[in-house]
Amino acid sequence: MRVLLSTAGSRGDVEPLVALAVRLQGLGVEARMCASPASAERLAEVGVPHVPVGLQLEGMLLQEGMPPPSPEEERRLAAKAIDMQFDEVPAAAEGCAAVVAAGELAAAAAVRSVAEMLGIPYFYAAYSPNYLPSPHHAPPEDERTTPGVTDNKVLWDERGQRFAKRYGDTLNSRRASVGLPPVEDVFGYGYSERPWLATDPILAPLPPDFDAVQTGTWILPDERPLSAELEAFLAAGSPPVYLGFGSASGPGIDDAARVAIEAIRAHGRRIVLLSGWADLVRPDDGADCFSVDEVNLQVLFSRAAAAIHHGSAGTEHLATLAGIPQIVIPRHTDQPYYAERVADLGIGVALEGPVPTFDAMSAAVATALAPETRARATAVAGTIRTDGAAVAARLLLDAVSREKSAVLA
């Protein structure tokens, strides 16, 4: 059996699908993945065939002083993202028994259109509950809304309308070119009628009354060793504080890192700094700060005193599973949700962004380093499920089996 996995997004969108792909391969399924060109090295490491599809996101990030894209540029990029899926995914999906998509929803809607054209089942996986439309929470804080509107249902309706306006014409034009009818609710079409929620039920529970399948988080055990230089740094002193913002970028991120380093040093702690997509650099040549470009977070977190990060789903699940206290400085999308969950669970501190004050950061570091916070983080870590990818793999195989039985009947 052959299955296609597809995502348009950052490393955080790719890694859960890597876990699912490896699990499927262990069950004898041939899993291949459509992902950005930047994913080539990672997929080669785990032996998952890679079909390069999508934009090179790292080169499109907003840096300090850069204006946001104009509406015309947004529409151009939206059309290009959808066109690339229609151009490349059909060949990759040929002969596949099912398609699983995750990440950017417009690309997923195009991928579902390809699955519809080929007559194969489609599944969408979300990495955060706040991506799922619900009257119990507002949409992610990454879109303009009508001033003064607070009703969650209205906010979700507005989001769907903006989505259709931005992507609908391109999507339906490409659908018409392959004989498919137009889609009015582009937003809902991408999500599917019953999406999967690839999150841990303790850390990120399913919203009440929402028809979705929660599988648990998809994490691939990472056995890559730390570099000899990092091992030497860790051995030379007490456990450091990890500081990194992953694929986050934009105005204020350099200042946030600077304030965090000052606060960590004020508490007499060392730092491991992840450069990330923002290309963060050490502020000086101090021996108490070690910089890394790529690192096994599963191993590093197990040896760190605390983690200061942006709160994306992937980093959040890894830090929670490791049982280390966290300080979350959220910026957008799922990050405010996970920051709030860290505070609610008592496993760390959620700070207001994008640049906390030194006093706020210093107080957060004190809380994170407190023994009671570590004890609570350790307790919560013991409740986190690690079988989410296995659950999803079995769900997928069962669904394909039912589909085949229905066809034969």
Swiss-Prot record:
It catalyses: dTDP-beta-L-vancosamine + devancoaminyl-vancomycin = epivancomycin + dTDP + H(+); chloroorienticin B + dTDP-beta-L-vancosamine = chloroeremomycin + dTDP + H(+). The gene is gtfC. Pathway: Antibiotic biosynthesis; vancomycin biosynthesis. In A.orientalis different glycosyltransferases are involved in biosynthesis of the vancomycin group of antibiotics. GtfA (AC P96558), GtfB (AC P96559) and GtfC are involved in biosynthesis of antibiotic chloroeremomycin, while GtfD (AC Q9AFC7) and GtfE (AC G4V4R9) are involved in biosynthesis of vancomycin. This is Glycosyltransferase GtfC. Its EC number is 2.4.1.-. One of its GO terms (biological process) is carbohydrate metabolic process. One of its GO terms (molecular function) is UDP-glycosyltransferase activity.
